[in-house]
Amino acid sequence: MTRVKVCGLTTERDHAAAVAAGADAVGIIADVPVETPREVSVETATALRAATPPFVTSVLVTMPATPEHAVDLVRTVAPDAVQLHGDLPVGDAAYVAANTPCPVIKAVTAGDQSAARYADVVDALLVDSPPTDDAGAGGGTGRTHDWAATRAFADRVDTPVVLAGGLTPANVADAVDTVDPFAVDVASGVEARPGEKDHAAVSAFVARATATPDPTLT
């Protein structure tokens, strides 16, 4: 079954709603150099991580200036996993993986022919849509990309692939059917307004992402 990560949680209320909806992972954005309404302070990130119950994965989402800074941030927040954004060299991603106790996810851009170079040094690849001027390089574009191409990419690499970019309750079932990803990631697609989740949309997204297809209809 495809796993679900609800990302960009900023409050305890939204965090609790994602957990109650059955999300497998919760994404908490901290210490990024781009403007986003989904970023929280390191202190809030630590508190939300601490509020994450057993069997739900807390994911620290960050865009580090240096690999050493990423390692320090992981030690401070103590997440179950860390997701790295930005133009981080492969060697720096490998450094983070070697010096942190948690799995490392590297965000890559859909269509980037060199993205597979990270596959041997991290634990998963998150394939997101190309950045817009508003979103910068930190995701949250609200735009989908070529899912068939991402499916082909996922088939080429041994590393688990997380699908992101423009996913909503309305399209996530089709996305899962097309890509068959290890997991899907949603942020803006389940928001009432930037930085605030629509709890009904979160529940609908999780339900549709994890629904078992009826074999009689295939």
From Swiss-Prot:
Which enzyme type, at the first EC level?
isomerase
Record field: catalytic activity: N-(5-phospho-beta-D-ribosyl)anthranilate = 1-(2-carboxyphenylamino)-1-deoxy-D-ribulose 5-phosphate
Q: Which Pfam families match?
A: PRAI (PF00697)
**Is Transport one of the keywords UniProt gives this record?**
no
Q: Can the keyword Electron transport be found in this entry's annotation? A: no
Q: Which InterPro entries match?
A: Aldolase_TIM, PRAI_dom, RibuloseP-bd_barrel, TrpF_fam
Keywords, sorted A to Z: Amino-acid biosynthesis, Aromatic amino acid biosynthesis, Isomerase, Tryptophan biosynthesis
Enzyme Commission number(s) from the entry: 5.3.1.24
Family note: Belongs to the TrpF family.
Against HAMAP family, the record matches this protein to: PRAI (MF_00135)
State the name under which the record lists this protein.
N-(5'-phosphoribosyl)anthranilate isomerase
**Organism in which the protein naturally occurs:** Halobacterium salinarum (strain ATCC 700922 / JCM 11081 / NRC-1)
| Taxonomy of the source species | Archaea, Methanobacteriati, Methanobacteriota, Stenosarchaea group, Halobacteria
Q: What's the name of its gene?
A: trpF
